[in-house]
Amino acid sequence: RAYHPICEYLETLKWDGEERIRYVLKKYMGADDSDYVYEVLKHFMMEALLRVFYPGIKADEMLCLVGQQGAGKSTFFRFLSLKDNWFSDDLRDLGDKKVFESIRGHWIIEMSEMIAAISAKSNEEIKSFLSRQKDTYRTAYARFEKDRKRQCVFAGSTNTYQFIPFDRTGARRFLPIMNDASKAEKHILDDEEEARAYFNQLWAEAMIIYHSEENKGNLLKFTK
């Protein structure tokens, strides 16, 4: 496999044996300690791993954090990206020709403003966008367009609890987790160094799960 900075970084992580995927959203965001929260976050993390180890794999669901402004939702996704330059929250308009510049080189991309203003029309647009496994575009100075398999996943954050126009075809794309900052053990920015170390261990745990499954397709199955 060709050198990939995210893959190489992930492979260097050593898990200390402490379970964190189940508790991180409770700890920093005040989410419930439930099987649903655990399964949704684990699913999203497995999609993110598969997208860098197997670019272009199907990954059309979006983890959405729902809760009060100032709770640290965007910071959560930034820390989850491990390095700030692997994160982007610059995706504003899916119809913009520069949308691919917002995707390229990033691993986790937050779509906060679009989720907050979601409508039936934009819901269809977002579903279509999420379902793509590759993007075709021409970079600056290139002569021809080129297919590029996606290596990123998309996340959402909103302050609005009624943000999804539930319909038979699209609601499953959005996986909401409710947050309550008043129930968080600590704010995610109280100790950034500690939080970033916690997220490194979060991915170290995820890598153990990833390598334990020979059939990688099983990683995306909800077990409960």
Where are the regions that the model predicts?
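Short amphipathic alpha-helical segments and helix-helix/interface helices
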Residues: 77, 126-127
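Feature primarily recognizes SF3-like P-loop helicase cores of small DNA viruses
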Residues: 2, 58, 85-89, 95-122, ...
